[in-house]
Curated annotation (Swiss-Prot):
This is Acetylornithine/succinyldiaminopimelate aminotransferase. It is an enzyme of class 2 (transferase). It comes from Escherichia coli (strain K12). Its main location: cytoplasm. The gene is argD. One of its GO terms (biological process) is L-arginine biosynthetic process. It catalyses: N(2)-acetyl-L-ornithine + 2-oxoglutarate = N-acetyl-L-glutamate 5-semialdehyde + L-glutamate; N-succinyl-(2S,6S)-2,6-diaminopimelate + 2-oxoglutarate = (S)-2-succinylamino-6-oxoheptanedioate + L-glutamate. NCBIfam families: arg_catab_astC, argD, PRK01278.1, PRK05093.1, PRK12381.1. It comes from the Bacteria. Transmembrane segments: none annotated. Pyridoxal 5'-phosphate binds at G108, T109, F141, D226, E227, V228, Q229, T284. Pfam families: Aminotran_3 (PF00202).
Amino acid sequence: MAIEQTAITRATFDEVILPIYAPAEFIPVKGQGSRIWDQQGKEYVDFAGGIAVTALGHCHPALVNALKTQGETLWHISNVFTNEPALRLGRKLIEATFAERVVFMNSGTEANETAFKLARHYACVRHSPFKTKIIAFHNAFHGRSLFTVSVGGQPKYSDGFGPKPADIIHVPFNDLHAVKAVMDDHTCAVVVEPIQGEGGVTAATPEFLQGLRELCDQHQALLVFDEVQCGMGRTGDLFAYMHYGVTPDILTSAKALGGGFPISAMLTTAEIASAFHPGSHGSTYGGNPLACAVAGAAFDIINTPEVLEGIQAKRQRFVDHLQKIDQQYDVFSDIRGMGLLIGAELKPQYKGRARDFLYAGAEAGVMVLNAGPDVMRFAPSLVVEDADIDEGMQRFAHAVAKVVGA
């Protein structure tokens, strides 16, 4: 007997999915490059990139080919064994960065969880069992597990789940004096995003990151860079630490690492990695052949002069459009960020209305993001075409006009 097929609509979400998201009223069904189409065939220019994930756009031929080829070979084997795609990708990351060891997980949360566990364990076994303090920053975002959401400095995400992990201190971002006031020899790690993405697209100052490096060295603490959102070419360098010239002890990567396929990584030195041993940590799916094959293909394209050297010109094209919109509608108080992670802060009269602009953008046929209630965020493909930038920003201008009532 045939099973009756019920139509899938936005209402289906409310009937079957846990209510932890509030998705748009339309359902995307197809993507190509920087364009997306919904169930009704409406086209959108995508400047959201799945929240800085689809770094090469949708359905890039090289990634599709890697997926198909590996999908016909070996999907999953578990970490009882190793596999060739994981070892190839690990070697590429090590050769391109400060790191000497890497471990693969499936999401930014998992990569950060791994980093925080390693930082604490390293301090305990190399220094003292009382060296457990983690210093992090207000408005940071590091994931949704209980540990990572507690390190993230946003109570709206971390409150309401009972006792939190102890010895986590939050201080203002870009405030080195505040860090000095709480830093001591009980500190095992300072955890920072070089660019706070969810927290408003705010970049660290060079002096701040250099100061953190010096404080960590002084107190034998590890400097952990969360580059889940700002890494993998987003800033115009492969990783943001390269732009700043400040080398962390541990770095986490996810999002763009797989170009849209779930994978994350934690990178560190051989000395720090040696604190872990078999059984210290693990993941059933982490480093599976399918994810690593796709990520390897993405890495080979992103880590090229053709891509990285083109990012600043694309950024300037976005900024020029945003400045033109601001001149016409007087809506932005600041345009900031780095590379193709761009934030546009709303003026006081539009504070709290970022999602209004987001929804109006979708109605006009362009996907954008917010970064909190007061900042519009753009995280497009790193290879977005100039024509897509121009058309998408024209659509966004129409959205702005609608919201401001022009």
